[in-house]
Every structure is written in structure tokens, then in C-alpha cells.
Amino acid sequence: MDNKRVILAVALSFAVLLGWQFLFPPQPQQPAPAQQEQTAQPNQAVDSSVAGPVSNQLPDPASTSAIVSAKGTRLTVETPLYSAVINSQGGLLESFKLKKFKATIDADSPDVDMVGTNALDKAPMGLILNGIATWANGVWGYEGANLNLEGDKLGTLIFRGDVEGFRIERRLTFHADNYLIDEDVRVINKSNPSGMGRIAFTTATKSLTAADDRYNPTRIAWFNAEGLVEESDRDTLSETGVTESGKVEWAAIDSNYFILALVPGADSVTMKGKLQDDIFRIAAEQNVSFDKDIERKLACSYYFGPMDAQLMAKVPGELSKAIDFGWFDIIAKPLVVALEWFHQYTNNYGIAIILLTIVIKILFWPLSHKSYKSMEQMKRLQPMMAKLREKHGDDREALNKEMMQLYKTYNVNPAGGCLPMLLQIPVFFGLYKALMGTVALRHADFVHFLPFTDIVWLADLSAKDPLYITPIVMGATMFLQQKMTPSAGDPTQQKIMMFLPLVFTFMFLNFPSGLVVYWMVNNVLSIAQQWMMMRNVKN
């Protein structure tokens, strides 16, 4: 077995894996913290732009008094993390803008809105009772006013409504230091016959990504006893949607970077998800016994924000499991931690990637040393191997037998040269997954402008290099590395090996620039190591 053939096989396998990723990307009760709560009082000031009454002192849900209508009143919630607008008619979420995330890298870009255009038509955070859209029926009022939360404070808004003989109270609690919203619902059957009914908590949003984005699709996901389940096929979501019954810890609409999740408080629900008019909708429905004049209490939590593991870990239902890197999860997550550690000292993710590359190279240095040594030994055996090929001709069995004896005699491992490459493949794909699925790297720049120009260059390490400079340089370094590698005796193998840099360059054109920077720097370090090895051999 020829060492160069093994390396060629590994390189081609690597190219196939990269090509596959390029052409077919993957389709994939909590105790309240001891915090100071700010419950908005009816006499708090309300912005003059908000229509409707300044305050409504509403009766207790158990009361038979009529509720004063406050239809159309828009209440705002301001925290350091987001700005939300809640409509008093049913407690609908009109907008939820993330203050720390921009829609694009442009300086005047608006904040990311987790609701988006036209999604209000599908009633985000709408409550459905026995199939009735509660926000579109009955009379609603509210208690409280605009909230402005800082530190670790909590704030509460209360919405009460009479809908088809039911008295409903929705109590929404907002967290200043998280994107979490906790909801407690009380329902009293005032005039309907006793019996079983249904309540569904819902949310909806526009597509979080471009419809044709294969690498970062908008998905409907849920987590049950079997683990994480995802559906991103738009045809499936439009035509039939998805349904899951039983113990569903949470359901969500998400992308690589953002998520809208609802976490039902019930042990058993029916989760439904669908794409309607380009709006993604999910609902978690549960059965409830509505005996007349008996109060029923229900609960649900929402999270509308970035895929931030630390913040999501504070949400019930193991929501942090939504961050999943697939097969390479065990590698990608430590790489994310390492990148974050380097970033806290460099304040630049590009530099953090370079430092991480150096650390990885140092860890692989002994193996690479053995690899280059093995390749040099194989190079010295080439004349003897050529004689064996000439001697045995087409007798492959005899040729292989004598070659194995030759390797044994000179203590050479024919597969030794490919070991570092094999070990780097999972690291490569782990970093690929990390760059594509870590919100901290979204819009993270390295060299914002091309030096000495005002041309935007590496302004987003999660996106491709718009000028294609780094993949071309990466290909050039790979070509140089091939030229320095001891050549194979087979001319055909030599030609294929020299052609590989062109194949890799083509595939890397649309890869995240952060990943290209990693591979380019890795090539440069490999060239330096190989040069040192060659110099030592000559000496």
C-alpha cells in the first residue's frame, strides 16, 4: 500500500465531505428567582402616543363586573436587551426588537425584530380557547402601563377579557436581564355548560432567514423524550405542517442564530406548527376541564431572542438543547468556548480564530512531525518500490506482499502520513458548525475594510469573503504545501494531488470567511513546520 495513495484517498474523502456540505447542507415549573419585581401600576405615566385610556383599574377575574374595553392600546416594555410592544386586545405581541442585534452589517441597520412584517396577522402570543381566537372576540382591558426595566428587575402587565362566556386573565412577567417572558393564565367558565375544553398558547413570526438560504433555514423545532426534532422543508410546513402530542418540553421557530420558543407548563400537549402566508406559526394546545364557576390556572413561558446558551439555560424545559451542532456537537461546543475565551482578551473574533488555530496546531505538532517523518521515509523507498512494480507487473497480490515486507524491514508505516489529516477533519467540521451556528460570530468582523481602501472586506466572519481573497490565498498555500510534500512515484497520483487545491478553493469560495481564515492559517503553519522538518533532514 503506497503512503501517497492513502493521503490521496483521505484528501478525496475530505473533498467529498466538503462537497456534500456545500451541495446538500443539513436539513435539520421553575421556581421564581429572588428578584425585585416591578409591577406596573395603573397610575404610571403612559406615553402620549399610546391610544386609549391611561389606566384601567380592572376587577378580579372572579368578579361579574363588566370589563372596560381598551381595544387597540399599545403598551411598551423596554429593557437593556429588547424593546417590545404588546397590544391590549388579547395581549398580542406586535413587535420584539433585539437591541444588541442588527438586521445587517450596515451602520444604519434597524434592530432585528423577532415578529416582523405581517406576522401580527397571525397573532403572536395569541391565546386560543376552544378554537376561538380570544384576541378577536369579546371585550379586553389591561392593568398597568409602559414598563422600563433595568438590572435584574421584573415587570408585569395584566390583560383581562370576557370571551364567549369565559373570564380570562393573562399575567405576563418580563425579565430585564433575559429574553424570557413568563405567563400565568386564569380562566373561569361563567356561562357555558361544564365540560372539557382546549387552550392553546401560540406564537408566530416572519421567516428568520431568506427562503433560499440552504445553510441557515428557518425551522420549526421541538424537544420531547426522543430528543430534538426539526423540520425546515417549506413544502412540508406549508402543505401539512407538523404535529406532536405528549410530553413536549418546548416548541420553537428558529434559525442558526435566533429562536422564538414557547415552553408549556402542562405535562401533555399537542404541538402544531405550520407555514401560512410566509408566516411561521406554532401552538401548544392542552385539554382543560372547564367546570362552571371554577377557576383554572395554566402557565407558559416564552423566549424570543438569540441562540445564547447561557440565557437559554435559565429557561425551563431544557431550551438550551435547541443549540445543536449535530454529529460534531462534542467538538463544536468546546471550540465555541475556546473562541469566546480568546475573544475576551482580543476583542476580535478573527484574531481569536488565528490563536485557536495556533493552539490546535501545537496540539497536533507531534503527530504532524511523525507524519512528515513517515513521508520522508516513504520518499526514500520510492526507488525500491519502483523496482518491485517493474518486477511483478500486473501481479498485484505478489506486489502488495513484497511492499508490506519492505515497509516492515524499514519500519515504515504507510498510513502514518495521513493521520494528522484524519484527526483534523472532525476539528474542521466542528469549527464549521460553530461558525455557522454561534450567534456571537454573526456580524463579527475581522478586518472590516480592505487595507488602504473603504471597500468592505471581512466584516462578517459567518459570511463568505465578498472579495474571495482569503479562499484564493488559502488555495495558494495549499498548492505550495503540495509542492513541498514528497512526491509520489505514480505520475497520475501527482497530477490529482496538485489538482486538489483548485477543488478546495472552489468549494471554499462560499464558506464562512472565519472558516477560510482558520484553514489558511493552518496551511501557513503547516508549511512552516514542513520547512523546519526538511531543513533538519538536510542537516
UniProtKB/Swiss-Prot annotation:
Coiled-coil regions listed: none
Keywords associated with the record: Cell inner membrane, Cell membrane, Chaperone, Membrane, Protein transport, Transmembrane, Transmembrane helix, Transport
Annotated region described as Disordered, given as residue ranges: 28-63
CDD domains cross-referenced by the UniProt entry: 5TM_YidC_Alb3, EcYidC-like_peri
Location in or out of the cell: Cell inner membrane
Chief place of localization: membrane
Biased segments, Polar residues type: 54-63
GO MF annotation: an example: membrane insertase activity
UniProt xrefs under Pfam families: 60KD_IMP (PF02096), YidC_periplas (PF14849)
Transmembrane parts of this sequence: 6-26, 349-369, 421-441, 496-516
Biased composition, class Low complexity, residue ranges: 32-45
Main function: Required for the insertion and/or proper folding and/or complex formation of integral membrane proteins into the membrane. Involved in integration of membrane proteins that insert both dependently and independently of the Sec translocase complex, as well as at least some lipoproteins. Aids folding of multispanning membrane proteins.
HAMAP family, alphabetized: YidC_type1
Self-association state and partner proteins as the record states: Interacts with the Sec translocase complex via SecD. Specifically interacts with transmembrane segments of nascent integral membrane proteins during membrane integration.
Record protein name field: Membrane protein insertase YidC
Origin species: Maridesulfovibrio salexigens (strain ATCC 14822 / DSM 2638 / NCIMB 8403 / VKM B-1763)
Gene behind this protein: yidC
